[in-house]
A protein has these predicted regions:
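Flexible, charged surface loops at secondary-structure boundaries
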Residues: 1, 17, 51-55, 79-82, ...
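Conserved beta-strand hairpin/beta-sheet module of binuclear metal-dependent hydrolase folds
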Residues: 1-49, 127-146, 166
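Catalytic core of the metallo-beta-lactamase
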Residues: 12-15, 105-164
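Pre-active-site segment of Zn-dependent metallo-hydrolases
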Residues: 21-60, 72-76, 150-161
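Active-site metal-binding loops of divalent metal-dependent hydrolases
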Residues: 27-30, 64, 118-119, 145-148, ...
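Short, charged, surface-exposed secondary-structure boundary motifs
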Residues: 34-36, 94-98, 108-111, 124-125, ...
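Active-site HxH/HxHxD metal-binding segment of metal-dependent hydrolases
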Residues: 46-106
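Cap/insert and terminal regions of metallo-dependent hydrolase folds
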Residues: 152-185
Length: 185
């Protein structure tokens, strides 16, 4: 039976543990934005003491906006866990996987991740490199949409016919009619 644990941090940050694979999602950020929390010094200290936030296999950022990504905290994490794979949609570190194609795949022991380029919500962010992913491990499938435009056809293409067991989505997916209709399909 597949085992999945989700541990939330601040804003869109989460740790997804599927079987024995630990994936950090938009977890490290320090810039506070209006109405959203961030990873301040106290939360950073508590995260370092919590097993759920230790030893990531994969560190993935959907995009590099400062409310989702901190280069400084990411660099610190890579020093603590040098074996972690880092995946970003733009070049930030010498040792990283840079997403650039419409769809890309990464295989880890016991887990596969299919990344897809998705439009960021809001016309003002049309040029922002932004990716979501479908994570499959041990018969369990999770969807990470980041700040994807609600009801995006590109997200539907990324999912295809794959049954989704868990979807981590921004609140407009539930509160706005197009998001709810998309989820029902």
């Amino acid at each position: 039976m597949p085992r999945c644990t989700v541990t939330l941090s601040a804003n869109a940050g989460a740790v997804l543990e599927l079987n024995l694979v630990r994936i950090w999602l938009d977890l490290l950020h320090t810039q506070k934005t209006e109405n959203f929390s961030t990873v301040g010094p106290e939360l950073q200290r508590r995260m370092l003491q919590c097993e759920a936030f230790a030893h990531p296999d994969l560190i993935f950022f959907t995009h590099c906006h400062p409310d989702h990504y901190s280069r400084t905290l990411t660099g610190q994490a890579l020093k603590l866990w040098p074996d972690a794979k880092l995946v970003l949609p733009q070049q930030e570190f010498a040792r990283q996987i840079t997403l650039s194609r419409p769809v890309e795949r990464l295989d880890l022991p016991g887990c596969s991740v299919r990344f897809g380029r998705l439009p960021h919500e809001g016309a003002q962010y049309a040029g922002v490199p932004h990716y979501g992913c479908v994570i499959e491990a041990g018969g369990f499938t999770a969807l990470i949409a980041g700040d994807c435009e609600v009801a995006s056809p590109l997200l539907a293409q990324l999912i295809g016919d794959t049954p989704i067991d868990l979807a981590l989505l921004d609140f407009p997916w539930v509160t706005l009619r197009p998001g709810g209709a998309f989820l029902e399909r």
